[in-house]
């Protein structure tokens, strides 16, 4: 009896696809740190990193070597187990969330019927990582940063989910591939769900703690926030995890609102991976542009903006979408 049954082969292929996708995401996340510094230098009319290699391209290699060889030091006053676990959870939760994102019609790790719910579950785990990091550090600035992060993330995750319910109501499924295929037969959701797109993008920036919602890490106020006591690879996991979060939110925006791997008007369907990559790169650059152009608001303004503006907007969008879908349902229309 052969061990290589069709079921075993499917499992092996799924594991290999997962390894390829996760390695590609980690590499892209590391490269984004260099890309961000070059773009910020260009937009702010300064040089940026340009000394290591041609056009500074080897700067990322120098940074990685420095990170690998720095001492992995644990301060004597920290809770060692939780202190070590926090960066692992932060990076792992974001990486695992990629398994439900379809990149091309044939390439993806897992085709789950609860794909969106799986993403929300993984996004929720990242809150615990930040809270663990601040609490286990026994540092008042780290604790304050983690409490800020928890309150901000919980607030914005409320309408991070509600912003997508309009998409789910129209498609009738939480499956990512179903959502992409629905957009191929109809309008991309950027048009009928424009307000949902706006609120999801704002919530995505806040959940990834990117500027202008980087209150948990505000250098001027909190001395780098919840990872002030981290060094070496532990700090590197938080650092790369932030860029992985940018890629994740950008890929979700493309999948849910911009037709996924489909080109505009069905142009060149054979270039599905290229379309997905180009659209994702556009939103990644938009994340970086926000950092270069918008000042950081006060923490109370960030929280007021979420509850007093974004949440009502998502509820109105959901109610209007549900009413339109209900009105157009044949059974209801016949009555």
From Swiss-Prot:
Record GO biological process: aerobic respiration
Subcellular location: Cell inner membrane
GO CC entries: plasma membrane
Positions of transmembrane segments: 11-31, 81-101, 114-134, 154-174, 187-207, 238-258, 270-290, 307-327
Broad enzyme group: translocase
UniProt entry tagged with the keyword Transcription: no
InterPro entries, alphabetized: NADH_UbQ_OxRdtase_su1/FPO (IPR001694), NADH_UbQ_OxRdtase_su1_CS (IPR018086)
Membrane topology recorded in Swiss-Prot or TrEMBL: Multi-pass membrane protein
Domain of life of the source: Bacteria
GO molecular function: NADH dehydrogenase activity; oxidoreductase activity, acting on NAD(P)H, quinone or similar compound as acceptor; quinone binding
EC number(s) from the headed UniProt entry: 7.1.1.-
Catalytic activity: a quinone + NADH + 5 H(+)(in) = a quinol + NAD(+) + 4 H(+)(out)
Keywords attached to this entry: Cell inner membrane, Cell membrane, Membrane, NAD, Quinone, Translocase, Transmembrane, Transmembrane helix, Ubiquinone
Transmembrane listed as a keyword: yes
Role, per record: NDH-1 shuttles electrons from NADH, via FMN and iron-sulfur (Fe-S) centers, to quinones in the respiratory chain. The immediate electron acceptor for the enzyme in this species is believed to be ubiquinone. Couples the redox reaction to proton translocation (for every two electrons transferred, four hydrogen ions are translocated across the cytoplasmic membrane), and thus conserves the redox energy in a proton gradient. This subunit may bind ubiquinone.
NCBIfam families in the cross-refs: PRK06076.1-1, PRK06076.1-2
Subunit annotation: NDH-1 is composed of 13 different subunits. Subunits NuoA, H, J, K, L, M, N constitute the membrane sector of the complex.
PANTHER family (alphabetical): NADH DEHYDROGENASE SUBUNIT 1 (PTHR11432), NADH-UBIQUINONE OXIDOREDUCTASE CHAIN 1 (PTHR11432:SF3)
Recorded family membership: Belongs to the complex I subunit 1 family.
Name by which UniProt lists this protein: NADH-quinone oxidoreductase subunit H
Taxonomic source organism: Pseudomonas putida (strain ATCC 47054 / DSM 6125 / CFBP 8728 / NCIMB 11950 / KT2440)
């Amino acid at each position: 009896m052969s061990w290589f049954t069709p079921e075993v082969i499917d499992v092996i292929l799924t594991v290999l696809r997962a390894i390829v996708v996760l390695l590609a995401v980690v590499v892209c996340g590391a490269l984004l740190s260099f890309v961000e510094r070059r773009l910020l230098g260009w937009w702010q009319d300064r040089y940026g990193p340009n000394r290591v290699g041609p056009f500074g391209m080897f700067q990322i290699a120098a940074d990685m070597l420095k990170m690998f060889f720095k001492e992995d030091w644990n301060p004597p006053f920290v809770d060692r187990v939780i202190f070590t676990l926090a960066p692992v959870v932060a990076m792992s939760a974001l990486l695992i969330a990629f398994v439900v994102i379809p990149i091309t019609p044939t390439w993806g790790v897992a085709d789950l019927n609860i794909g969106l719910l799986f993403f929300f579950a993984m996004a929720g785990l990242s809150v615990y990582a930040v809270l663990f990091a601040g609490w286990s550090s026994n540092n008042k600035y780290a604790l304050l940063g983690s409490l800020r992060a928890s309150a901000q993330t919980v607030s914005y995750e409320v309408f991070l989910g509600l912003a997508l319910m309009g998409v789910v109501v129209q498609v009738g499924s939480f499956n990512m591939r179903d959502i992409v295929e629905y957009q191929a037969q109809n309008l991309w959701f950027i048009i009928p769900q424009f307000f949902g797109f706006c609120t999801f993008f704002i919530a995505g920036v806040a959940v990834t703690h990117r500027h202008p919602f980087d209150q948990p890490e505000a250098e001027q106020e909190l001395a780098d926030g919840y990872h002030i006591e981290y060094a070496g690879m532990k700090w590197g996991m938080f650092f790369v995890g932030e860029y992985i979060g940018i890629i994740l939110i950008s890929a979700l925006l493309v999948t849910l609102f911009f037709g996924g791997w489909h080109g505009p008007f069905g142009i060149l369907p054979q270039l599905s991976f290229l379309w997905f990559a180009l659209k994702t790169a556009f939103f990644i650059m938009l994340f970086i542009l926000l950092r270069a152009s918008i000042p950081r608001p006060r923490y109370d303004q960030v929280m007021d903006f979420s509850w007093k503006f974004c949440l009502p907007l998502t509820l109105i969008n959901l109610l209007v979408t549900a009413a339109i879908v209900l009105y157009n349902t044949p059974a209801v229309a016949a009555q």
